[in-house]
Amino acid sequence: MTPAFLRTALAGAAAACLAVPAGAFTLGDNDALTLSGFASAVAGKVLSGQRQENYYRYPCPCFIADYGHGALYGPTWQVKQESKVGVQGTYAITPKLSATAQVVGRGVDGVKTRLEWAYLSYDVNDSWTVQLGRKRLPIYYYSDFQDVGYAYTWVRPPTDIYGWEIVNYNGINATYRADWAGWAVKSNVFFGREDSRGNLMQRLYYDDPQNVTWRKLFGGDLVLTRGILTTRATYIQNKVDQISQVDGTHDPEGGKQRIYGLAANMDIDRWFVRSEYSVFDRSAYSYRSRAYMVGAGGRFGDFTPMLTHTRYRERNRFTPDAIQHDRGWSATLRYELGASSALKVQWDHFKDLSGTDLSYVGTSKLLSVALDTVF
């Protein structure tokens, strides 16, 4: 699948969704256009931390809250790092063909709006759906709705496992749904690529702006649900190119990457457990990372407390003393304000165990408050 073809497909998907005839906006049970949205107002402050000098251009003590979008909190209250608003529209072109677009504005970007989703969707039959265009890269269990803070208990999904340099992709995917002996089955396979200029995550690790490309993307996932249990397994492979905008240095160039992931979630009456495990393997560069999280909580009327433990560790035999290694704990309290809004308070303790040759963010404690809503 060539970049030119992907650009053409993406433009077509966006145009199909935006070129809606006036009659589609009329109210009624059979509206062709469906609109929805979400918003999060998040404030955070690092209460204490080990590092006192700046981390690149960021004041410390500091805490990385969103790797994928380069959001980092410092020693004063900040509201732009994770605050965001998004609007999504789906237009039914025919009973089987639809177009979807989603625009998101993030405070960390200066509230610049970006087209996060833009795809055409065709229902082949009751089991199969084919989609073409721009979507969220399905690395993690919460990837598809990670931006919708109202959809989960935390202020943010655990950062030790959630967050990588590429968030979206342009391509094609096919989704299969069925029931296997009492198990609800959902499976997805996809192909595509993504080009990220001035990559947001890499500005946390480099002084110079970096361009990152994930090409020859191929992957799939399988979600099984039965009763109290939901499980998910995923596999993704691709080639990685990274180049400095300043001097053209490649790091890496065409390196092969494999991603493996497992998740298992349980809901037993008021109690619930959330767990996830992921591996990123770039063996050609002797790089491999492992991360996991496990959390548990309970629902007590409008209140939902939750405790979560996380861990992340890299391996690199070329630079064994410059690996990132950390673990963390978070305590979250969610309060339901109504049918579509929730208030959350979260305390995070990040323990930096990185190698002596890596100058990282250091151990820190973060307090954050979020107001999440959907509409």
Q: Residue locations for each model-derived region?
A:
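Bacterial N-terminal signal peptides that target proteins for export
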Residues: 1-10
